[in-house]
Swiss-Prot record:
The lineage of its organism: Bacteria, Pseudomonadati, Pseudomonadota, Betaproteobacteria, Rhodocyclales. The gene is apaH. This is Bis(5'-nucleosyl)-tetraphosphatase, symmetrical. It catalyses: P(1),P(4)-bis(5'-adenosyl) tetraphosphate + H2O = 2 ADP + 2 H(+). HAMAP family: ApaH. Transmembrane segments: none annotated. Keywords: Hydrolase.
């Protein structure tokens, strides 16, 4: 069995299918790990959702910020909707309710075999197992009766740092922001949400979340996406896979067993290495 971890798809369904074919993926024996942001900005979010859902247990996807945005507008309507999203086809689909219900069941974090898959990252003070427990708190709300209320309170940049005594919507918001939006943070874990450039553009006293010298999760390989300006980055304890397909760059897969890289350019297949 091979596991192929794939970066942010964001509705780039044609490139996604080309990449899956290039990998030689066999759904009867292999698995896809998808780092979230299945939807939005690209042209084929509906086809992407339908295909991933059809794979059943052969695909594991975590939730990204764009997936959560889809849930929000599905339940809250036009309030807070961005003018240039590409999600109307999903919202008008005959199987919309089934797809949205399925999306609500996806995990915020997946932990398996020394790997932790999460869309954006983990705060420097979090280790993998406790972080998984925090993710379950959010998952329980998303799949339960409080989902709509939570989605109404989910957006926001504060609090910017984790505290164990946080409660209610603030607690859940910090967990979601760390796992789906974070790029840079301070040594004490205060997140910065405006800076979206490459690592060398970090604001003063900020580092990429994975570069903190005392990162508590350094014994776990984090598989993530979200940061297209970072691009493909492979370190002993990091696989960052957002290589900017929706921006005209590449969609990337890495086979976990040997770290072989497979890539498809937006519009052209690149091959593997």
């Amino acid at each position: 069995m091979a596991i192929y971890a794939i970066g942010d798809i964001q509705g780039c369904f044609r490139e996604f299918r080309e990449l899956v074919d290039q990998c030689g993926f066999d759904p009867s024996s292999d698995r896809l790990w998808l780092v979230g942001d299945l939807v939005n900005r690209g042209p084929a979010s509906l086809e992407t959702l339908r295909f991933v859902r059809s794979l059943g247990d052969a695909a594991v996807s975590v939730l990204g910020n764009h997936d959560l945005y889809l849930l929000k507008i599905a339940y809250a309507g036009a309030s807070g909707r961005k003018r240039h999203d590409t999600l109307q086809q999903v919202l008008e689909a005959p199987d919309r309710d089934e797809l949205i219900a399925w999306l609500r069941t996806l995990p915020l974090m997946h932990l398996e075999g020394g790997y932790a898959m999460v869309h954006a990252g983990l705060l420097p003070g979090w280790t993998a197992e406790p972080a998984r427990a925090l993710a379950r708190e959010v998952e329980a709300v998303l799949s339960g009766d409080s989902c709509e209320a939570f989605l109404q309170h989910m957006w926001g940049n504060s609090p910017k740092a984790w505290r164990d005594d946080l409660a209610g919507w603030e607690r859940l918001r910090v967990i979601v922001n760390a796992m789906t939006r974070m790029r840079f943070c301070t040594p004490d874990g205060r997140m910065e949400f405006d800076a979206k450039g490459p690592p060398d553009s970090a604001p003063p006293n900020h580092l990429p979340w994975f570069a903190h010298p005392n990162r508590a999760s350094s014994d776990t390989t984090i598989v993530c996406g979200h940061w297209s300006a970072l691009g493909l980055r492979m370190e002993p304890n990091l696989l960052a896979l957002d290589s900017g397909c929706v921006w005209g760059e590449k969609l990337t897969a890495v086979r976990l067993e040997d770290r072989r890289v497979f890539q498809v350019h937006a519009g052209k297949q690149l091959g593997s290495f």
